[in-house]
């Protein structure tokens, strides 16, 4: 069986890690001890604060509360907002500051642009108001030169959330060009792309590298650490993960509306990501009741690199309006809602591409019984193949169906018969709807033959839907324009909000696990990852060795 796909990319890293309990004995549960099983703990929140004074400009008042204890041991998790608002009639007048564009043109969005940008065919205003009332044909900056819009450039600068959630929107208007026609050539496809104003540099680079790594872990928590290591290395964070927004009300209540800071479009590229909450909970649900081995397959494809401008960046009208809508007096709920929408940090530079990451849950006992080794499974899935760039950037993966047959003394074992691979957990990021949904559909149907062919298919779609795969981060509050009203105060408030955000959802609000278990907080619920010799919702049940 073979599959071939042609696609352009910069770096292809196929990394295989083995996360395993090692050569540990099998255990069976001892008789249940009811006294050791903790009762469910429901989410507990503090009382609401008093309502704030009525903000004269926003015509709203606010209140907040805190999470005291997260749900744990099958109790109700914390899913409600910590902030609240309501309309009010102010008793003071609002001191509004009108935008003055001077000799420049004022857009319908309020943006100020140079008059030389009028009637050039570009959407410099963001609402095309600069292209109204044009008597003559547009004067496009690129004239007769052929250029295309870059999906890498559109994605550049996207934010990251310190607790792991993908931001709902981007602050940058990367479809603004300031009347320039800076072209960047993709050496793979020989296509010229137009570089947006916000990017100081954009490079399509072509490199190829492969790295195979095998590691063994004796406890599940060590496997979990390896999966979330990137986020922890960025922020020195504890085991707290939050993937579901609870404060960004606009995007929750109006799912059909665009939360991207730009107009919705039928042609908008879909960037796929599986539900991280469900994925991590599924991963943690595999206890050490039976000896498991986790085959961690990671393929990183880098398409290019970018560096954002350090000053004079053009931000989306939505981002600026949301900053203006923040109360000058600190209100925890409102500022956390802003962080959940745009991220706690943005990418000042980084790499774009896709992350192909799967975790195969292997049944170690069945492998031993049938004489199947780890390298046999790797060979069957095709992850021992060389993936190297050839002429015209063709990547071909050839899988022999006989590689999935293992002969032992008694029989011929089919590795794909279902008894060796318990599950496939996906952490894939990037790629278009077509290949991402095909793979998701395959997993939902219980397929356990996700292999290198699926990797090649997915990789071929990344040019159209890249995501950030590595970045240098800067706090989101650094983007507040210094000339905006109350800019200094709101910057200080956002600094405070990031600290409050970390403390509000800290794992310290969980009860400890028993017998050396590690507590992990995911989306308002505390879970226990148990050592090899224990199991249960609190690691309260010991396992006796099976002779």
From Swiss-Prot:
UniProt activity-regulation remark: Membrane attack complex (MAC) assembly is inhibited by CD59, thereby protecting self-cells from damage during complement activation. CD59 acts by preventing incorporation of the multiple copies of C9 required for complete formation of the osmolytic pore. MAC assembly is also inhibited by clusterin (CLU) chaperones that inhibit polymerization of C9.
PANTHER family, per database record: COMPLEMENT COMPONENT C6, COMPLEMENT COMPONENT C9
Primary localization: secreted
Keyword Glycoprotein assigned: yes
Annotated MACPF domain residues: 138-509
Subcellular location: Secreted; Target cell membrane
Domain EGF-like as annotated: residue spans: 510-540
Domain LDL-receptor class A: 99-136
Topological category with respect to the lipid bilayer: Multi-pass membrane protein
SUPFAM superfamilies tied to this protein: Growth factor receptor domain, LDL receptor-like module
Domain TSP type-1: 42-95
Carbohydrate-modified residues: 260, 277, 451
Gene Ontology biological process: cell killing; complement activation; complement activation, alternative pathway; complement activation, classical pathway; killing of cells of another organism; protein homooligomerization
GO cellular component, as recorded: extracellular space; membrane attack complex; other organism cell membrane; plasma membrane
Disulfide bonds: 43-78, 54-88, 57-94, 101-112, 107-125, 119-134, 142-181, 380-404, 510-526, 513-528, 530-539
UniProt keyword annotation of Signal present: yes
Function: Pore-forming component of the membrane attack complex (MAC), a multiprotein complex activated by the complement cascade, which inserts into a target cell membrane and forms a pore, leading to target cell membrane rupture and cell lysis. The MAC is initiated by proteolytic cleavage of C5 into complement C5b in response to the classical, alternative, lectin and GZMK complement pathways. The complement pathways consist in a cascade of proteins that leads to phagocytosis and breakdown of pathogens and signaling that strengthens the adaptive immune system.
Chain segments annotated as transmembrane: 235-242, 265-272, 374-381, 382-390
Signal peptide: 1-21
Pfam families, per database record: Ldl_recept_a, MACPF
The protein, known as: Complement component C9
Quaternary structure annotation from Swiss-Prot or TrEMBL: Homooligomer; about 20 C9 chains oligomerize to give rise to a huge beta-barrel that forms a 100 Angstrom diameter pore in target membranes. Component of the membrane attack complex (MAC), composed of complement C5b, C6, C7, C8A, C8B, C8G and multiple copies of the pore-forming subunit C9.
The species this protein was found in: Equus caballus (Horse)
CDD domains tied to this protein: EGF_CA (cd00054), LDLa (cd00112)
SMART domains named among the record's database cross-references: LDLa, MACPF, TSP1
Family listed: Belongs to the complement C6/C7/C8/C9 family.
